[in-house]
Amino acid sequence: MGFVYYVTLFVFIDDWVGLQSSAGKLNALLFSLLASLCLFSLSICVLVDPGRVPASYAPDVEDSGWSNSNVTETRKCDKCFAYKPLRTHHCRVCRRCVLKMDHHCLWINNCVGYANYKAFFILVFYATVASIYSTVLLVCCAFKNGDSYAGNVPLKTFIVSCGIFMIGLSITLGTLLCWHIYLITHNMTTIEHYDSKRASWLARKSGQSYRHQFDVGFYKNLTSVLGPNMIKWLCPTFTRNPEDGISFSASRDS
């Protein structure tokens, strides 16, 4: 991230319009804002606990199936030897159960789960926007200074290498962003997506249609992660919602 920030400001913007110009200052300010939002989102992903099962948690036996508004399931972790709520999984790296676990992310050295999934998604969003923005600035810089770069082999090699890197980074982050948009709009975690493949195959085999049990509709799926206030959707701080990480609204209740 530090390398991308440095070359964007002191190479791409400076060589294109100059950092002291009005356009240069504006672009530097906008990119610095994006970089700050990335760092803020990253810090939340790293520092916030993804979701710990309460020590006092015990499933309600009478509510072990479908209820009026929520679904729960009695399950016990064979590693923690404790009850774990629905959508909770045991992380082999963290060596504990995580509420609504999506995956363990090596880049943040933390699990992505109920309490920090929004921050992770917003981090990917801002990082994608920043990488595309940097790539556009690189292209503008290259078009303006193409002739001068052509006569300087080391500089030309550096610019081309940066272009390959930034395009690859933008495609990678953009793909990751699209993937998590898909998961959010279907109210799935990464783990549940792969689990649902078999369920979907079995449903088709028996001539039935399959719908993920927590898919409660496009808008409700979005608000379950991003929160009910649209103004705060791009703020990475965790937004409390009616779900508590232990019980969740189910599709047959929607």
Curated annotation (Swiss-Prot):
- What parts of the sequence cross the membrane? 1-21, 28-48, 119-139, 164-184
Question: Which EC class is this protein assigned?
Answer: transferase
Which biological process annotations from GO are given for this protein? Answer: protein targeting to membrane
Catalytic residues per the record? C105 (s-palmitoyl cysteine intermediate)
Top-level taxon of the source organism: Eukaryota
Which Pfam families does UniProt cross-reference here? DHHC (PF01529)
Naming one, the record's GO cellular component terms include: endoplasmic reticulum membrane
Topology with respect to the bilayer: Multi-pass membrane protein
Q: Where is the DHHC domain?
A: 75-125
Protein family per UniProt: Belongs to the DHHC palmitoyltransferase family.
Q: What is known of its domains?
A: The DHHC domain is required for palmitoyltransferase activity.
Listed name of the protein: Probable protein S-acyltransferase 15
Protein source organism: Arabidopsis thaliana
Q: Name the encoding gene, please.
A: PAT15
